[in-house]
Swiss-Prot record:
Signal peptide: none annotated. It comes from Synechococcus sp. (strain CC9902). It comes from the Bacteria. The glycine cleavage system catalyzes the degradation of glycine. The H protein shuttles the methylamine group of glycine from the P protein to the T protein. GO terms for biological process: glycine decarboxylation via glycine cleavage system. NCBIfam families: gcvH, PRK01202.1. This is Glycine cleavage system H protein.
Amino acid sequence: MAFEFPAAYRFADSHEYAHLDGELIRVGISAFAVDQLGDIVFVDLPDVGASLDKGTSFGSVESVKAVEDMYAPIAGEVVERNEAVLASPEELQNDPHGAGWLLVVRPSDPAQLETLLDSATYSAKVNAG
């Protein structure tokens, strides 16, 4: 199965995405990661106001297969979290790049986006294996 990813998104090697939306960054996990996890049963996210450091764990996602940490693709402050995903984890499964987003972050250094993989590079990486 070949995965397609939104062209404007940037991706971490650990499969989280960052999407610039005005001055804020929408964060989630890729459709590839969701597919690898299987049926998602629980999502744990930080509270609004929490500080994220790039590359450090910010929460976890639990599926029937495993519990996996999620890592911040960018540093900043959490300004919103997706309560719908917390209440119904299947939202993440159904639309990871849309309604299944996880956090909105006010970045401390927006230039960190440039350190992430562009959509084409990430797509080639996950579709090659």
